[in-house]
Design a protein with these regions (language model features):
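Short, basic (Lys/Arg/His-rich) helix/loop patches that form interaction surfaces
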Residues: 100-110, 126, 181-191, 205-251, ...
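C-terminal catalytic core of Y-nucleophile DNA break-rejoin enzymes
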Residues: 79, 157-178, 188-212, 227
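Conserved tyrosine-mediated DNA breakage-rejoining catalytic core shared by Y-recombinases
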Residues: 8, 72-73, 96-98, 126, ...
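C-terminal flanking helix
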Residues: 52-59, 268
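Basic/aromatic-enriched alpha-helical hairpins
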Residues: 1-35, 54-56
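Catalytic-site neighborhood detector that most strongly recognizes the C-terminal catalytic loop/helix
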Residues: 84, 151-152, 157-162, 246, ...
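C-terminal secondary-structure termini that scaffold catalytic or DNA-interacting sites
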Residues: 95-102, 144-146, 182-189, 194-199, ...
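Basic, Lys/Arg- and aromatic-enriched nucleic-acid-binding interface segment
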Residues: 30-41, 45, 49, 60, ...
Length: 279
């Protein structure tokens, strides 16, 4: 709204704010620090929410007279999902992480890279949100034997949808077992994932970016950048392609069936259907 008086801001002004905000930096030759030429939908939603909060506060202070509350909202026309690794890309990332451990210049760097490797393994085979993984404790991981006689692990996960049990893919259990043995000896009551100095993981995005850069797979074929969340999406797509039911995938990931279908339904063709489609 610029220099507009707060009592003059209405729904029309707020709706016009979105295209103005989206295009504001488009013509800048040099961007200010931390500014993005093309703000994300999430940024636009946050800015809209902030503007409405300011107007609401002004109304509570009697600065808007009898003007009605702002009801305008911003909803992206199309929800975007962070890209999911293709199987060959994940394998390439895995091989690169292993090589980076072998070439680490010192003990601290080696430990950081070993942490990234097990962190990537668990998220890619469980669908955890990064925030959920960062809060896991050693005592939240419980061994069990499944109906096929395989040793596996059940996690007690606390996330934005509450507490749930989550099962990791059995293919990861041997490496996880080795890591768990190490963490139980170091700090049996501590965090499952801890930095080399013992502190909580905030984010491993810098380490992941370095590994992706070395692997030559920073972006997918559409130019979309891979992030830590891409591991969660990789899990969802692979599970659906392997024929795991939508309900089971949603429950394990702490998401709704609708979200799983909307976000991943077009990306993941189950093997049985892919076979039929290829006939």
């Amino acid at each position: 709204a610029g220099h507009m008086a707060v009592e003059d801001i209405d729904d029309k002004v707020m709706r016009e704010f979105i295209p103005w905000r989206r295009d504001y930096y488009a013509s800048f030759e040099v961007l200010p620090k931390n500014a993005k030429r093309h703000p994300t939908d999430k940024t636009l939603q946050w800015d809209m929410m902030l503007g409405k909060a300011i107007v609401k506060w002004a109304a509570s202070q009697g600065l808007r007279g009898n003007r009605p509350n702002i009801t305008a909202t911003y909803t992206p026309k199309k929800k975007r999902v962070r890209p999911a690794f293709e199987t060959w890309e994940f394998r390439q990332l895995w091989r690169t992480m292993c090589k980076r451990i072998d070439t680490a210049r010192d003990v601290r760097t080696r430990k950081s890279r070993e942490l990234l490797k097990i962190y990537v393994l668990v998220l890619a085979n469980s669908g955890f949100r990064p925030g959920e993984a960062n809060k896991l404790k050693v005592r939240d991981v419980h061994p069990f034997i499944d109906e096929k006689g395989r040793n596996n692990y059940r996690f007690v996960v606390r996330g934005k949808t509450g507490e749930r049990d989550a099962i990791i893919r059995s293919a990861a259990n041997k490496r996880l077992d080795k890591y768990l043995t190490k963490r139980r000896a170091e700090d049996p009551a501590g965090l499952l994932f801890a930095m080399p100095d013992g502190s909580k993981v905030v984010t491993l995005i810098d380490q992941l970016n370095a590994a992706l850069r070395d692997a030559g797979i920073e972006r997918n074929s559409f130019g979309e950048k891979y992030t830590i969340y891409s591991l969660r999406h990789f899990y969802a797509v692979q599970a659906l392609r392997n024929g795991v039911g939508v309900f089971e995938v949603a429950r394990n990931m702490g998401a709704s069936v609708e979200i799983i279908q909307e976000y991943y339904g077009k990306q993941a063709t189950a093997a049985v259907f892919a076979t039929r489609l290829g006939d």
